[in-house]
């Protein structure tokens, strides 16, 4: 499923990707299947997430919601963060030692913190991952100018401001 959203000059896109047979398959949305463009309706394998992102021009989007068919070792999530040049990874060993009320924190840009709690980590584990640009996170500072620092949490619908 592919859906484009715009929010205050922030481009966002939702895509569904299957990891099958050691390759990534980008699934077209229903409308693209009936498109006159063969490129939009085609389904083909990609050897890496970087190849998929580059060939589909996904770097031009500030936020891409990925829906994988599972990401139990956080391999895909970690690759997405590396593609956006964020030095943040999730390791299974970290999660095993976490208490239910503990969170993982990372700061993609100054004054913006992403808090991954059990609910957010569970979403990523099930394949609902994000690939956001530094511009996207800076945009949150503009949306909430009265706050010196912004904390975001990852949810199924996207990032939410932590109250």
Swiss-Prot record:
It comes from the Bacteria. This is Uncharacterized protein MPN_499.
